[in-house]
């Protein structure tokens, strides 16, 4: 455990990374940073195992965030499909509009089941690595599918700031590559 007030300038440098999403991101540079033995958390030599276990929790939390995003996109798309009238009827009466939203809903709910499985394993102290990775993968894919369905449902209006779709679209894309890329799971 390191007190940043003491470490910054004494071997630790924090460099912000500018980005377009609502997540503060920084690079950390360690250069001969001395850490007292009293700062040790857990058993010496087991730090990597602790990190991996922490990543399981992180991936499960990211899965939950993706599921929330996916549900937001589905609700936004569904509401717009009900309200937007073209040629005298709501666009949601067209199967071509309905099916991508319904498919995204199915994918989000399936990802949520895997997320709960990972949470339960983690809470019981079991190895949740595989379930956490599957939950993160499925949820990232599901939220991205929901984002695409939502943007497609809104058409050109999906890029208008007033609908918030374009902002969330950019944010949910992040989880295809972070905290671990879906093609590395």
Feature roles, as predicted:
Residues 25, 45, 57, 96, ...:
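Active-site lining segments that contact anionic ligands and/or coordinate catalytic metals
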Residues 43-44, 93, 124, 161:
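Residue-level signature of the cytosolic catalytic core of signaling kinases
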Residues 67, 71-74, 101-111, 115, ...:
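Alpha-helical transition-metal enzyme core signature, strongest for iron centers
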Residues 78-92, 105-138, 151-154:
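C-terminal helix-coil-helix/basic helical segment that borders enzyme active sites and/or dimer interfaces
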């Amino acid at each position: 455990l390191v007190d940043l007030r003491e470490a910054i300038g004494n071997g630790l440098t924090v460099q912000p990374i500018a980005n377009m999403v609502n997540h503060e991101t920084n690079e950390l540079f360690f250069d001969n940073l001395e850490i007292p033995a009293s700062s040790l958390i857990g058993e010496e030599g087991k730090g990597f195992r602790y990190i991996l276990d922490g990543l399981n929790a992180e991936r499960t939390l990211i899965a939950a965030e993706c599921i929330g995003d996916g549900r937001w996109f589905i609700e936004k798309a569904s509401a717009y499909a009900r309200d937007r009238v073209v040629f005298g009827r709501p666009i949601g009466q067209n199967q071509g509009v309905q099916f991508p939203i319904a498919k995204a809903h199915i994918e989000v709910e399936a990802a949520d089941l895997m997320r709960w499985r990972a949470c339960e394993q983690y809470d019981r102290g079991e190895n949740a690595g595989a379930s956490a990775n599957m939950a993160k993968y499925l949820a990232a894919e599901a939220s991205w599918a929901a984002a695409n369905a939502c943007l497609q449902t809104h058409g050109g209006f999906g890029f208008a700031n007033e609908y918030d779709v374009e902002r969330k679209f950019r944010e949910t894309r992040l989880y295809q590559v972070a905290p671990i890329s879906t093609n590395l799971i």
